[in-house]
A protein has these predicted regions:
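Intrinsic disorder at enzyme termini
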Residues: 470-551
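A glycine-rich helix N-cap at a beta->alpha junction
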Residues: 75-89
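Phosphate-backbone binding interfaces of nucleic-acid-interacting proteins
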Residues: 528-651
Length: 651
């Protein structure tokens, strides 16, 4: 029997900088949905990737003194690292710079051109470089800026090719009327209808003022405009034009999940492109809300951009995933707060789930030598628990199918709370004192273990490394793929032997100075510093005597990537690092242990004084030195060449 297929995508993210917690939010949503559909036994294809072309990237690369591909390669390595550490289960990672994608874009462009839907003319108008968007003057905000990002637009005049979007306006309005669920939530649909009814303009789809893009097949001096290029990734990822059987297995897509700021591109431009190509429409485009930080939009200028890798180092990936999915209603803007995260982890994961597992396994070991047995000594309270489980599973499936993820999670946690209450109501510690109640005690223990087994299945899309830990402590073999069909009562085998392990989630303690202590380890919380007033700025260290340029040229500074890091025994200040510099790996000993943990260093790019003579520190030969900044009071901070590849020269 052929399994149903399910195709889900995230936006492909723009590698102008490293990803923040908002990107992690979108991708975690998509991952939980992909895992849920695998849980249902469906054949899932989950695509994410990077949108690498455009004027913005070309300008950034030029500023850094590297080629565009060198610039994006370094950032995309961090994209992939984040998804790996966040346990994102994507089936493919598409890059628009890949040859497979170039062919799809050029073939699509040629097809639409050949049928007369593309024409050439001189374009004169307004362009937002950060958003890669064209605007009419009437569409600008009250300050004459881009209505999406509110940054200044540039006047552009160049020869361009245009896609006849206006030709398809009536078709689009009719399609949306006939398919009201195509754009979700409904508020986004109404916005798009109002936008189109103002009159669709033809879309500029090529550029000649930069060359970092896919060449237009019928006019090589042009490159493809970013959005016409980027949207086609959803076809490239499932082998459009390469493997028809595979493509038709997954197309049309079940869900394009995007941020609300790019709904217009995905619900107006994309379906018109597909219609012009003669392809079916995706089933749904869902525009989720933004993630704000402590009630304020993330911005570098405000110093409130949250690095998800730092959060994962401190709290663990599953805790971050759980908070994002549990705390936020999908269609609305959500608020990220460190305090709310800590409270949610302590209350839901440590207290509710963690304590239920710990109490259950501890009592089974104490009273029955770790063996789970159902004797059939049932009472009405057991039937209530079983009925609640059946109801919870049904409501869970309904909520997830409707993309009401936090509703599904709340339902599972209501079951967990009921199981904790069941312990108090059945009082196993009292049953254990009465030999006549021995069979009843065994059944109570079985019921708790079986509830935990089913809970582990239901939470696997959200906190995927936690479910295997529960199974292991219950003495069960962890399946290659959890299945919803196994979330039925009575599948825990009699005679199973539990195995108590470490707490699932240690409680998080917060110190007076804002640091956290998790599992005995302290993590400093570095709040964003306010801008200093002129009179508050600390005095600068005196500048050393001047040197000549030839003296400076003797220093060879290179970008290195830290592969391994460990503390040097008997030293409070030193870390021993294995650093890749181009094609070689060096041992470097650095006095940064008071400011950086070894785990923070692995995978990090650093600047190395590469031609420094070797020196022995604590008996270890150090072949280089890391470049740091100092505030004059001894505090060190590494110089961070995130966007450069290992071996690059620093000038």
């Amino acid at each position: 029997m052929t399994k149903p297929s399910y195709y889900i995508t995230t936006p492909i993210y723009y590698p102008s900088d490293n990803l923040h917690i908002g990107h992690a939010y979108c991708t975690t949503i998509a991952d939980s949905l992909a895992r849920f559909h695998r849980l249902k036994g469906e054949d899932v294809f989950f695509l994410t990737g990077s949108d690498e072309h455009g004027l913005k990237i070309q300008r950034k690369a030029k500023e850094k003194g590297v080629t565009p591909i060198q610039y994006v390669d370094a950032i995309i390595a961090n994209f992939k690292l984040l998804w790996e550490r966040l346990h994102i289960s994507n089936n493919d990672f598409i890059r628009t710079s890949q040859e497979r994608h170039h062919k799809v874009v050029q073939d699509a462009l040629q097809k639409i051109y050949d049928q007369g839907d593309i024409y050439k003319k001189n374009y004169k108008g307004l362009y937002c470089v950060p958003c890669e968007s064209y605007w009419l003057e009437r569409q600008l905000d009250e300050n004459g800026c881009c209505p999406d990002c509110h940054r200044p637009v540039e006047e552009m005049e160049e020869e361009s090719y245009f896609f006849k979007m206006s030709k398809y306006q009536d078709w689009w309005l009719q399609f949306i009327e006939e398919h009201p669920d195509f754009i979700q939530p409904a508020s986004r649909r109404n916005e798009m209808i109002n936008f189109v009814k103002q009159g669709l303009e033809d879309l500029c789809i090529t550029r000649t003022t930069f060359d970092w893009g896919i060449p237009v097949p019928f006019d090589k001096k042009h490159v493809v405009y970013v959005w016409f290029d980027a949207l086609l990734n959803y076809l490239t990822g499932i082998k459009y034009g390469v493997d028809d059987e595979f493509f038709h297995k997954f197309w049309p897509a079940n869900l394009h999940l995007v941020g609300k700021e790019i709904v217009r591109f995905h619900t107006i431009i994309w379906p018109i492109m597909l219609h012009a190509m003669g392809l079916e429409m995706p089933q749904e485009v869902y525009g989720h809300g933004w993630l704000v930080v402590d009630g304020d939009k993330m911005s570098k200028s405000k110093g409130n951009v949250i690095d998800p890798l730092g959060l994962i180092d401190e709290f663990g990936a599953d805790a971050i995933r759980y908070f994002l999915l549990r705390e936020i209603n999908l269609g609305s803007d959500g608020n990220f707060s460190r305090d709310a995260l800590i409270n949610r982890v302590n209350a839901d994961l440590a207290n509710d789930l963690g304590n239920l597992l710990h109490r259950t396994v501890s009592m089974i070991e104490k009273y029955h030598g770790g063996i789970v047995t159902d004797t059939g000594a049932s009472e009405p309270i057991d039937d209530e628990l079983k009925a609640l489980i059946k109801e919870t599973v049904a409501n869970y499936v309904k909520a997830m199918d409707n993309m009401e993820i936090n509703t599904a999670i709340k339902g599972v946690w209501a079951l967990i709370s009921r199981a904790n209450k069941y312990i108090d109501e059945t009082a196993p510690w009292i049953l254990a004192k009465d030999e006549a109640k021995a069979d009843r005690l065994k059944t109570v223990m079985y019921n708790l273990a079986e509830t935990l087994r089913i809970v582990a299945i239901l939470i696997s899309p959200y906190i995927p490394t936690t479910s295997p830990k529960i199974y292991t402590q219950l003495g069960l073999q962890v399946p290659e793929q959890f299945l919803l069909a196994d979330a039925e009562w009575g599948k825990l085998p009699n005679g199973t032997k539990v195995c108590k392990g470490e707490p699932l989630y240690p409680r998080i303690e917060v110190t007076e100075d804002g640091a956290t202590i998790i599992g005995g380890k302290r993590y400093e919380h570095k709040a964003a510093a306010p801008a200093l007033k002129e009179e508050e700025k600390p005095a600068m260290e005196p500048i050393k005597p001047e040197i000549t340029f030839p003296d400076f040229e003797k220093i060879d500074l290179r970008v290195g990537k830290v592969l391994e890091a460990e503390k040097v025994k008997k030293s409070k200040k030193l870390l021993k690092l294995q650093v890749e510099i181009g094609n070689e790996v060096r041992t470097i000993v650095s006095g940064i242990s008071q400011y950086y943990e070894p785990e923070q260093m692995v995978g990090r790019n650093v600047v190395v004084v590469a031609n420094l003579a070797p020196a022995k520190l604590m008996g270890i030969e150090s072949c280089g030195m890391l470049l740091c900044a100092s505030d004059g009071q001894g505090k060190l901070a590494l110089v961070d060449p995130t966007e450069l590849v290992s071996g690059s020269r620093v000038k």
